[in-house]
């Protein structure tokens, strides 16, 4: 298992669903718990000249990125069922980053797919 590092901040929130217009879909305010990142994800973000903050915000608000329609629907169900949520995003240099919020919402981790 790769060494995990805390990133950005630690925040615990309650999940809130909002009817804010966003193309017809509700926006999640997913509780993230403690934010962690693997060394590979930290390095990939640095090489791409990007921060993980934008990706984390997309994940937190229900934009699951580049996942299949089946996985997108599973993530949407997980908001109410309390299951794990997995998002996938491509960095500017094409490297893929996954963000996983555990079912108990105590930890959200940024990692490379091969670090899973």
Language model features with spans:
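Short, compact, well-ordered microdomains
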Residues: 80-116
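Intrinsic disorder/low-complexity signal
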Residues: 9-11, 56, 62, 70, ...
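Compact soluble domain cores
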Residues: 21-86
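Short, Lys/Arg-enriched N-terminal segments with co-localized hydrophobic residues
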Residues: 1-15
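A generic structural micro-environment signature
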Residues: 7, 36-42, 51, 61, ...
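Context-gated lysine
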Residues: 12-14, 34, 47, 92, ...
